[in-house]
Amino acid sequence: MNPLASTKSVRHVLMALAAITSIFLTVGCGTSGSSIPPLGGGFTNASLKGQYVIAQTGIGVNQAVTSSDPFSETIVFTADGNRNLNVTVDDFSQDGALLIPTLPLTGTYSIGSDGTGSLSFNGSNYAITMVDDSHFYVIEQDLFATASGFGEKQDTTAFTAAPSGNFVFKAHNIDTSSRVGGIDITGGAITGTEDFLSLGLLSSNLAITSAVSMSAPDGANGRGTFTLSDGSSFNYYVVNSGKFHFMSRIGSLEIGQAEAQTGGPFSAATLANNNSYVFGSSGDTSLSGSVAIHSAGVFTTDGSGNIIGGTVDYVQDATVNSNLTVSGGTYTLPANGGGRGTINLTLSGGSISPQIFWMVNGTRAYFLANSTAAVEDGTFSLQSGAPFTALSSQAAFVMDGFDVAYKDRVGLFKPTSGGFNWNQAANSFDVNLFGNPTATGTSGTYQISSNGRVAVTVNGVTSSLVFYLSAANTGFMVQEDADIGGAFTQQASQ
C-alpha cells in the first residue's frame, strides 16, 4: 500500500524532511531503534507471538508540522513469533482530531535474549522490554515523536461480547483532567460513580451512565465503542474478560483502563493493621504542563482508619520533596461505598495532596490526587516481601517526564555483587531540536531501606533516583534531579 495514504505517515515524511537540518546540526545524536546490550535471559523472537494491545501517551510534531503537541495512541498488532507484525488498529489522537491510518499495516520486530527489542511499522520505531511473554514496556524512539506506554497480550476468546460486571477504572486527559470510579456493565449499559478532577478545580463525585451502550467488540481486534452521558465517547479495546483499555474517539487526549472489581465488600479493615501499601502516580500541573509531577511512597495502615507510618518522595514543577516521613494521617473506606475511599497523609517537613481511591481488589486500588494545582493519578498496592535487604533479580522498567526536554526510557536493570547493571533505550525530545534516540549500557549502586525505599545512582544517567518496592524487584520510581518517574517489574524466568 501507499504509506502516504495515512495522515500520520504524511507527518512522518514531512517531519523527516524538516528534521534533516537538525540531524546535521546535532552531532552524535544517536539512531532510532538502537539496540541494548543484552543482560542475559531466555527470551527469543518467539516470545512475542499472538495479538497485543499498546496504550501510550507522548509528544510529537503535529500533522501540519507547525508545533509539537501531546498525543494519545492505542495500537493493536499481531506478532507471528518470527519477526513479522500485522497492525490492525492504530488510533492516534492529537490537536482535537482522531487520526486512523489505512489498515492493516505490516512491520517487523526483534527480541533479544534479555527481553529488550524493537518494533517498526508505518514509519515509527519503538523500543520495548518484555516483562514476560504477555506484557512489555514500550517507548517511541523517533525524531518526530517520543512516547511511553505498556503492551499486553489480548485474549481473543473474549471478543464475543461487551465486558460485563463490576469494574474500576482510571483515565487521564493530558493537561486537562483525571478520573477514577466504579461502574457496573450490564448488557453493555454502564452505570456507576466517578470522581472527576479538572485542572484548577477540586474533584467532584458524580454519577456516570452510558448514553450509548458498549457495542460488541470487533471479532478480529477486540475494539468496540461507547458514549457516556457527559458527552464523552470512547473506543475500547478488550484485553480479556476482566480488563479493557479505552481512549477518546472524539479528539480529546483522554486514555484509560478498567479492571474487574473483585474481593468486596470493602471496609476500613480491608487496609489491615500493619499492612503497608506502595503507590506511584504522575500527572500534569497548571504551572509547568505535561508530566510535571511524579510521586511515589509507602504508607502503613492500622485497619481502623489511621495511617501509622511511611515515607514519600515527589517532584513537582522541578521542586524536590525527598524522603519525607509519614508522621500520621487518616483514611476512609466505608462498608457501603463500593470500594471508594480517601487517604490523607501527614508528612514531616512537607505536604502532599489527599488521595481519592477505588479498590480494584483487596490489595490494589486506582486513585487520583485531589488538588487544584495538578491532574495526577496512579495506583497503590499491598507491599509484600518486607523487610527488604537487597535487589535480587532482573527487572524491566519504563520512565517518562521532563527536565530540559521530554524524556522516555525503557530497559532493564540486573543486580550484581557490587550494585547493578543498567541498560536503557531512551528518547530525549526537544520541541525545537526534535528527538534524540539513544541506547546506554552502564552500571550503578544503591542503598536499600527495610521499608522498600531504595536510593539509586545510575552512572552517567542520574545520581538521584528513588525506588519504592511493592514486591521484590517491582515497584515505582522517582528521579529527583528532574520531573521524571516510572515503574519497574521483575522479569519472568525464561
Language model features with spans:
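C-terminal motif of bacterial Sec signal peptides marking the signal peptidase cleavage site
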Residues: 24-28
